[in-house]
Amino acid sequence: MARAVGIDLGTTNSVVAVLEGGEPVVVANSEGSRTTPSIVAFAKNGEVLVGQPAKNQAVTNVDRTIRSVKRHIGTDWTVEIDGKKYTPQEISARTLMKLKRDAEAYLGEEITDAVITVPAYFEDAQRQATKEAGQIAGLNVLRIVNEPTAAALAYGLDKGDKEQTILVFDLGGGTFDVSLLEIGEGVVEVRATSGDNHLGGDDWDQRIVNWLVDKFKASSGIDLTKDKMAMQRLREAAEKAKIELSSSQSTSINLPYITVDADKNPLFLDEQLSRAEFQKITSDLLDRTRAPFQQVIKDAGISVSDIDHVVLVGGSTRMPAVSDLVRELTGGKEPNKGVNPDEVVAVGAALQAGVLKGEVKDVLLLDVTPLSLGIETKGGVMTKLIERNTTIPTKRSETFTTADDNQPSVQIQVFQGEREIAAHNKLLGSFELTGIPPAPRGVPQIEVTFDIDANGIVHVTAKDKGTGKENTIKIQDGSGLSKEEIDRMIKDAEQHAAEDKARREEAETRNQAETLVHQTEKFIKDNEDKVPADVKSKVEAAIAEANEALAGTDIAAVKAAVEKLATESQALGQAIYEAQGADAAASSNGAASSANDDQVVDAEVVDEPVDTEKK
């Protein structure tokens, strides 16, 4: 049986691991390192360099070296090299191809199957694009797994049967995730997850770069941001300084010949950066990790004291300020030191590959979807079919109907987010179900099904139950959710809960009124010869009042009109019932009597509860 590998495709570094005799082993690359920089360079001679060789030549080949492409995955971003445009998937595939080659060299056999990890807060387009990158690299992607979940799997598999609550704090090169999981008896279950797709070690590096640029400009008057080669050297020096400050109180940043002055004299950059200064210029970045942590605790419905262990993932968690913050947030809990933050995700991915291949027994991984999914229904309401933090894979269906008579098609708009009003959420995609046969409103039955697979990729199907006709969309367009969008979704959902509830109630009241008007008008038309004139005039007046209220903005008037119309409709039904009863008593024909009894049953439809229509 062909072997499967686990791959941590990171923003700044990537790792590949494989099971050897049931135990995960991190594979060293051809340069002898266990981590591979996620950097791709196109040399001028046509050669494509990946990893450390690409990083080594970045200063002299700035425009043709691509780094941190993971931040663009799932978007329409492209980079042009020699007249050809490359997508993030294609660049990521180059890194995956190198990892694949290194694993094949280590194992001495061809590799085709892989489990690839992504940040837990990656939305659908980003997951789909990651899978596509694997396919471009010649890999059969068995599963897309969330990074914190993989880390918990690697950490918790040998911890026995005792149930434990694990907090995974994952700060990588470009993304941040925090997840709460329960581990016990071979089951790894995600309780809640949150994060920021645009926060990572790169942002800390950039603050050092900005600090150096400002210092150099103040001393020499020269703006280094206009010099691409100088900026590349600054980026490399910043990363090195950040790493040194994790173990030292200060570091020296010395870059000779960084640029030249107006007289072509060479200039040197020589600065001392203390850990205190570094923490000061990056304090706001650190603070951005607090809100997702609090959100996860709230969503999981636990207190901080319920956390048994804290696992730090990602090289950026080596910064002392990060581990100090985690201690503060968890009430002084010491983060676990038994895992390598750079490698633990790949190890977990290899274990999951082993589970899928049958090499690892009695392990069940239960992941979740990070944000709610639903469609827009009548009144602009967001009807959620799948709530956030629902265990995946999952499938949910709900039946909707048309809003107008003889409506030939329905537009299905798929949204992701927490707000009650659809327009306030993120539109993932839309499609149309056409060919609905002419029918009165409320008659067609449209079944909408949301299916999230184990990779977290969404499929939506709309089916006309009457004709069997259906249409499907696999959500794969759109771009990644920015921090602002994610914050807005969750914060707005809390701040505007009352407003959203009122809007939803208003939409439901209006739908109810329209339905009652429609049903009553139809009932009068169908029973015109049986309706007493005085009763009919009262009902028609109530209908007119309801229509007038619906044309206005006063929801209280709509409610009052609905109540009045419901009362008059009931009187209408009662009048017809009594008239038919009198006819039956006067008749001596049993068959006629029986027929009239049937009509009595038909008339009772008025008393049935009115359902809110959705489209």
From Swiss-Prot:
Secretion signal, residue range per the UniProt entry: none
Region annotation (Disordered) ranges: 580-615
Gene3D superfamilies referenced in this protein's UniProt entry, alphabetically: 1.20.1270.10, 3.30.420.40, Actin, Chain A, domain 4 (3.90.640.10), Substrate Binding Domain Of DNAk, Chain A, domain 1 (2.60.34.10)
Induction statement: By stress conditions e.g. heat shock.
Domain of life: Bacteria
Phosphothreonine: residues bearing it: T175
A molecular function GO annotation: ATP binding
Residue ranges, compositional bias (Low complexity): 580-598
Keyword Phosphoprotein in record: yes
InterPro entries: ATPase_NBD, Chaperone_DnaK, Heat_shock_70_CS, HSP70_C_sf, HSP70_peptide-bd_sf, Hsp_70_fam
Acidic residues bias spans: 599-615
Keywords recorded for this protein, A-Z: ATP-binding, Chaperone, Nucleotide-binding, Phosphoprotein, Stress response
Family of the protein in this entry: Belongs to the heat shock protein 70 family.
NCBIfam families on file: PRK00290.1, prok_dnaK
Function: Acts as a chaperone.
UniProt-recorded name of the protein: Chaperone protein DnaK
Gene: dnaK
